[in-house]
Amino acid sequence: YEICACLVGSEMCIRDRNLTPQRRLALVRELKKLTGRMEWLVEALLKMAQLDAGTVVFHPQDTTAAELVRRAAEPLEVPMEVRSIRFTAQAGEERITCDVPWSTEALGNILKNCMEHAASWVQVTARETAIFTEITVQDDGPGFAPEELPRLFQRFYRGKNAGENNFGIGLSLSRQVLAQQNGTVQAENVLTGGARFILRWYKGTI
């Protein structure tokens, strides 16, 4: 659908000579938004195909929760500011051994999901045990309907609160990335309201 919409919009801009300058400018702006969404969708689908085919070679290295959160949150700083979402991170020197770029992708998808559903804030915390290092992402949004939780990480599943930019891919991709790095991700509702995602990188085989 996204690709078709982009192509149709492009054709309108090129062929319709009766468009006013204002209408043409509005179409160009909308096309830029559609193109950005299309690029993200194509990249995500390619990554999932690579993971499915087993062609991804992970390169584990030592990092910290603070560094991983910083990398994942950086691209979302402006969108959060535009949405007036307050972002706080309580992550420090908790050690994580992982493929940093892929784990940044996984965490970034979770952060993006929380940002899109938050009412006013997104919070990240981290802790380390002898068995795993855990990063928790929480928001103050509507949370999940009970029937959504079992399907949340299924590919192409879109919940009832899914926005127009939600393709049902990001959470599934995050789970794939974590699973192939000896990790897990789960989601739950917070009793006081909002959603919580728990990502774990284990230090041994699970």
What are these regions (language model features)?
Residues Y1-G9, I14:
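Single conserved hydrophobic/aromatic residue that forms the stacking wall/gate
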Residues S120, G183-T184:
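Conserved glycine-rich
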Residues K33-M38:
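Short alpha-helical segment of the dimerization/phosphotransfer core of two-component systems
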Residues D139:
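Acidic ATP/Mg2+-coordinating residue in the GHKL
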Residues L19, A53-F58, A91, R95-C98:
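Conserved micro-motifs of the catalytic ATP-binding
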Residues F144-Y157:
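Short conserved segment of the HATPase_c
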Residues W121-I131:
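Short beta-strand/loop element within the Bergerat-fold HATPase_c
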